[in-house]
């Protein structure tokens, strides 16, 4: 397994950071979102508030990074609940069972490890 970081993900991560740092709409963040959208000939976005800008970044990440296995990490990173799926109930942010347990073999080899809460 080799982790791959696409350029669009880098741009969207920077846009999200800029959006979260400011108190209003950051022009650089909007430009980064629109750079990603321009690659696929999508219409540019022009959010009017900080919340709308953050929502636009998260939506674009969902579209751009679909099916790449990053959904759960997105929810954990942004502090949002993980939505329910066909056979799995919604998991609240901070729930004991959102993060998997550390394998016992790893715990046995490193006595300084602390098991994740709930296991």
Place the predicted regions along the sequence by residue.
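Acidic/polar-rich alpha-helix caps and helix-coil junctions
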Residues: 1-119
């Amino acid at each position: 397994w080799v982790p791959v970081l696409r350029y669009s993900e880098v741009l969207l991560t920077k846009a999200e950071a800029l959006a979260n740092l400011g108190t209003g709409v950051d022009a650089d963040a909007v430009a980064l979102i629109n750079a990603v959208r321009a690659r696929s000939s999508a219409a540019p976005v022009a959010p009017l508030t900080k919340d709308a800008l953050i929502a636009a970044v998260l939506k674009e990440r969902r579209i751009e990074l679909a099916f790449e296995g990053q959904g759960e990490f997105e929810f954990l990173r942004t502090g949002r609940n993980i939505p329910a799926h066909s056979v799995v109930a919604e998991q609240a942010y901070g729930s004991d069972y959102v993060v998997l347990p550390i394998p016992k073999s790893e715990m046995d080899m490193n006595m300084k490890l602390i098991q994740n809460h709930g296991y």
